[in-house]
Amino acid sequence: VNLNSAIVIYPNPSDGILNISGVEKVDAIRAFSISGQLIKEAVNTNRLDLSSQRSGLYMIEIEHEGATSVNKLIIR
């Protein structure tokens, strides 16, 4: 399964609450600043709360069944 085509991150742009659909539960979700610093990580969930983060562009890494997907997220 191509993870990039299977998952959808929404809403994007976001107010900080990130949801993932397309797979049951992802193994891990990691949010990185655009400079590569790990901001937050969650495991065995399809939701990540980034509402405490500043507005801007973030990279979201999703791990599921050995595959990894990286997506851009804009927080308003």
What are these regions (language model features)?
Residues 1-76:
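C-terminal outer-membrane/trafficking sorting elements
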